[in-house]
Amino acid sequence: MSKIEILAPVGSEEMLRAAVFSGADAVYLGFSGFNARTGAGNFDADSLKEAVRFCHARGVAVHVALNTTVYGGELAGLADAVRAVAASGADAVICQDLAVAKLIGDIAPQLPRHGSTQMSVHTLQGALELKELGFARVVLARELSLPEVEHITEHCGIETECFVHGALCMCVSGQCYMSAFLGGRSGNRGSCAGPCRLPFEANALPEGKPGRLHHLSLKDNSVIDKLDKLQAIGVASAKIEGRLRTPEYVAAAVSACLAGREGRAYDRDLLKNAFSRSGFTSGYLDGKIDGTMFGVRSEADAELTKKTLPALRELYRRERSRVPVEMKIEIEEGGEKLTVTDGTNKAFAYGDAEPQPARTDPTESLSRSLSKTGGTPFSVEKIDVEMDGGPWFVPGSAINELRREALDALLKKRETLCPWPVNEVELPPLPLRTLPPHRTLRARFERWEQVPEQALSGVEYLILPIAQADRVPREWREKTLLELPRVMFGALEEDTARRIAATQDAGFAGYEVSNIAHLRLCRGLPMTGGFGLNVTNNLAAQYYADLGLSSVLILPEVKDSDISTIAPTRDGKPVPTGVITYGHMPLMVTRACPLQNIHDCAHCDKTGLLTDRKAKKFPVRCGLGVRTIYNPVPIYMGDKPGALTVDYGVAYFTLESREEAAAILDSIRQHAPFEGEFTRGLYFKGTN
């Protein structure tokens, strides 16, 4: 059984040293401009090479995060970033956007790709689809239980990676739009402002009263004491979250993970003092998802961290001897030769000290001197001593100099970069769409009861959750797309597969897919792309079109000028693109329930409100094992039909009654102003 890899976060050069010196097997760090932690100290082409040299010399792998969504105007810079990573010889790239995966496959096809947790992979079919697309590893969603992780790991055929320590986002990674819509800072772009750490109160509050409790803030995850179980089921890598944290935090987490992997006790209090939010939770992996998972960073927590810093720094003050080497020293009358090998590389050192005849066997003292590798990454496993005509005495100072010279030479050899082969790839120019002569309207409803009788009039497609399929009259089905659940925890993926099988010959127009797993579930069937795919550029849109999508809904975070550069084709014909024209945007989809802070499920009607510090009320709806938190203000673009160069708009109904939906559809058809509070979303502002 292979040892599970300890993978540490790096957000600065000091964090890199802390991770390596405390014993991490691998590190992950961000490449400037294209990673999900823009606030961290990220690496450019030159500093990345130095980081790879430092790590590879010590037997530590380097994974580079290029795991943001990318806009069209950034694709040329992204291609340069891929070339830089390939030139560094880093061990893998972590990516979210299929445009990144596509460019790696074209430019540096041998460079391994890891599917970021931002890809929202949480099911077996999602992991299998990544394998089909050429990924070597999948970083699984944090929300999974141990049996769910085991099921995926056992059957997916690629490596799996699990978070074992660090911050827990409230929302399923890759599906959070709260920071973008509330402040223009996109989590999918690495700029999350962390609004879930602000007050959001689930208690019923009077209108105008601000929320003061933190019912969207989860404690930090820590399942280090379950590393043996993760290792036993075949998980390849144990990931520590925290590129925005400190070297001391990294050292504490790595040290604890090393102990946990070996079944030794570790100082849980020291780990907690390094950083916690009122303690830790293991609720997801244990399958115990309840109100005890929530917590905040208190002043007492911060004070404990300050007091613990000196002890934590001791964990990474010294170089760790971690690279096993073998030595052979040959002594003859004219001088000495020392050979050092790590099994792959060899280094030599020659001495000219004139050996003197020894009165006793010097083998033991020679071995002692040669074994003194403190301050280097090397650990001597074996020493051979050969003497021609001896025994010979050589001064200890001469032996020490030989050792230093040979180990320095070996270190330099290990620091040699091994770039990945690259292909010359020229990116096609960005397309520039013009406004189509006729733009269509699609209407998405949460349940059949919302659908007005006149909905088919002037609507290209209805979109309904697949669980509502039996409610749709046969005469409506050829214009109805069945929406698959964005998130399918537990048995929901198998249930969804059964529903697809039961409906594929029932006269429906096709399926709206919003997760990478859906591509596999619907292979060979008519598919359209939903916003959960996070399409932000033409390269990704084209990739999805090549995988079978007949239309693509662009992520509502994309600005108008970037929307106009998304124009995929299929068989030489344009593939329609669309935007959400109306709707309360689902800002979060969560497995933990914020309403559990005030009552249990038995006393819940599956609806609720969260009130923020500005007294805004965010609707919450529970269903299919998750909770969806909606923007209190809807997007409305119905009176701006020519503002966005797309083929269709989607009226995305969630909270509305049938009468409200009918009135809104009429307003969109008539290009009328919206009555009430609304937002243009990010279509004109964009995100940073």
Residue ranges and their predicted role:
Residues 132-135, 157:
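Extended, well-folded interaction surfaces typified by the phenylalanyl-tRNA synthetase beta subunit core
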Residues 2-121, 140, 147-237, 244-543, ...:
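Active-site pocket-lining/capping segments in soluble small-molecule metabolic enzymes
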